[in-house]
C-alpha cells in the first residue's frame, strides 16, 4: 500500500503557463496531496480568465491538502504584482524566488515530502538584477550541497548529465576525475534511495566520437573517463562504458540498463526529448529533498489561452510522488 505524501508545487513565472497548469490539475481529483506555492490573487485572476470554477483553500502546515476535483490548497505568497498573461514583469522576480524558497524550506523542515516546479523565466529574473542560473543551482545553494546532478526521465529512459549548461568548448576541461566521480556516486545512490533499484546498471557515454577511437579522436576517455570508471567499479558500482554515444542509445544497450550517464547536455537530451517530449520529467539528484520539474519552458505565447498541455506536469507530480513514497518506505536519504 502506497504511503500518502504531500508535495509543494511552485507555480513558476506568473506571466507564463505555470499558474494555469496548476489550476488545470485541480479540475480533476488527485492521489497526492498538492499545495500550490503562489499568490492566491494570481490564481483567482487566472482561473477567472480561463472560466475555471476552482475553490482555493488557504493551507498551513499540519493541514491536509485538498485532493477533490474543483478544490486546490494554496500557500499564499506575497509580492506578486498585477500580472498580464504572456507579458513578463521583472518586478515579480523576487516573488518567484520566494515561492522556491518557501517550498524548499518546507521540504527541509518536513512540511512537504517533495517539491515540483513549474517553469520560471531565467532571463527576466536576471534583468531584475538577481543572479539566477536556474532552479537546480538555486536549490543546490539553498540546501547547502556541494554537487547536484540533472537527470531527465521518461517511462522508458533516464539520462543524467556530467556537465549541464556549458558552452561545448568548455566541456572537455570540466570533465575531471573528481566531477565524474561525484556525479556517478550521486546517480548510483539516488537510483537506490528514490527509485528502489538495488543495484543500478549505468551506461556511460564517451565524450568523443566512437568514444575516442583508441585515442585517435581524443584522449579524454583514456586519460580521465576509463581510469575513473575503473575506480568506481571497485566501489561496487555497476558501470558499462565509456560507450560511443551513437550506439549507446539502442535497445541492445538500453534494454539492460537503468540509466544513462551522458557527458554533456546535447549528447544525452536530444534522444530523450525526441522520444518523450511533453512526457518527460526533470529530476534534481544530490539534494536532501525530492525535486522534480516539467521538461518545458514558460510558453508565454500560450499563457492565458487554456491551450497549455499539462502532460509533463502530471508526469513530474507522479514521479515526485513515487520518489517520496520510496524514500518513506525505505528510509533512505532521510534528513538527519
Curated annotation (Swiss-Prot):
**Family annotation (HAMAP family):** PdxA (MF_00536)
Q: Where is this chain primarily localised? A: cytoplasm
UniProt keyword Flavoprotein, yes or no? no
- Which cofactor is recorded for it? Zn(2+); Mg(2+); Co(2+)
| Example of a GO MF term | magnesium ion binding
| Subunit field text | Homodimer.
The taxonomic lineage of its organism, from the top, reads: Bacteria, Pseudomonadati, Pseudomonadota, Gammaproteobacteria, Pseudomonadales
Pathway note = Cofactor biosynthesis; pyridoxine 5'-phosphate biosynthesis; pyridoxine 5'-phosphate from D-erythrose 4-phosphate: step 4/5
Q: Which residues form the signal peptide?
A: none
A GO cellular component term found in this entry reads: cytoplasm
**Where does this one sit in the cell?**
Cytoplasm
Stated family: Belongs to the PdxA family.
Which species does the entry assign this protein to? Marinobacter nauticus (strain ATCC 700491 / DSM 11845 / VT8) (Marinobacter aquaeolei)
The miscellaneous annotation reads: The active site is located at the dimer interface.
What GO biological process term is on the record, naming one? pyridoxal phosphate biosynthetic process
Q: Which residues bind substrate?
A: 135-136, 273, 282, 291
Q: What is this protein called?
A: 4-hydroxythreonine-4-phosphate dehydrogenase
The record's PANTHER family line, in alphabetical order, gives:
4-HYDROXYTHREONINE-4-PHOSPHATE DEHYDROGENASE
**Entry EC number(s):** 1.1.1.262
The residues that hold a divalent metal cation are 165, 210, 265
Enumerate the catalysed reactions: 4-(phosphooxy)-L-threonine + NAD(+) = 3-amino-2-oxopropyl phosphate + CO2 + NADH
